Amino acid sequence: MRVDENLRLDEQLLLFMEQLEALEEKRQRLNSLIEEGWFSIAKARYSMGNKQVSALQYASEMQPLAHVETSLLEGGTAEFKCERSENKAEEQKTKTIEDIGAKETGLRRRVHTKQKEVKEGEQDTDEVKTKTDSPTPEHRNPLKWFGILVPQNLKQAQSAFKEVITLSVEIASLQSTILATRKEMQVQMKEKQERTEKAQLEVKEE
């Protein structure tokens, strides 16, 4: 019984140490990316000019390109996920194209089956083309605030800070997992200590 308890505690401790090591690696990577991003912005300012890369170029209306979704798992552990708007826009675009393709297939069948519905089919086709041609609202790339042709340094800065967002979410999830692991380990150690003290009292009484 005690062997199983000790083994379980050892496994829990090893897991805890592995999680701490992973957290340290992610934090180092995060700091490195932040430094890289700011250094790239500094180089872009040097080549374009300070006034060309500043808050003055920000759009009057902004929309976030990334959202953080949180969920509570079993045991009280919080999980964080990063959802990017460009991914959702791409999925929506693909779904729209599939829906339009299905409608066009249905129209062709109706035209071949019933000659009387040719005019109605043409009207439906025109509506489908109108929906296809109409521009869908998309999130504007923030790089375009600073011009059409921006230096590579500015693109590198954007890429670095995008990864910073993703990595920050991973770190938050890992920190929550570490807290849960530590709490579980503390509970096991407390139970073991109580059993040990109880056993010692029984020995003294004998």
Swiss-Prot record:
Coiled coil start-end: 4-37, 178-206
Main location (coarse class): other
Alphabetical list of Gene3D superfamilies matching this protein: 1.10.287.3240
Gene Ontology CC entries for this record: COPI-coated vesicle; endoplasmic reticulum; endoplasmic reticulum-Golgi intermediate compartment; endosome; lysosome; vacuolar proton-transporting V-type ATPase complex
One example of a Gene Ontology biological process annotation: vacuolar proton-transporting V-type ATPase complex assembly
A single MF term (Gene Ontology): unfolded protein binding
One Pfam family cited in the UniProt record for this chain: Vma22_CCDC115
Record keywords: Coiled coil, Cytoplasmic vesicle, Endoplasmic reticulum, Endosome, Lysosome
Listed Basic and acidic residues bias regions: 114-140
Residue span of region Disordered: 109-140
Subunit structure: Accessory component of the multisubunit proton-transporting vacuolar (V)-ATPase protein pump.
Name of the protein in its database record: Vacuolar ATPase assembly protein VMA22
Originating species: Danio rerio
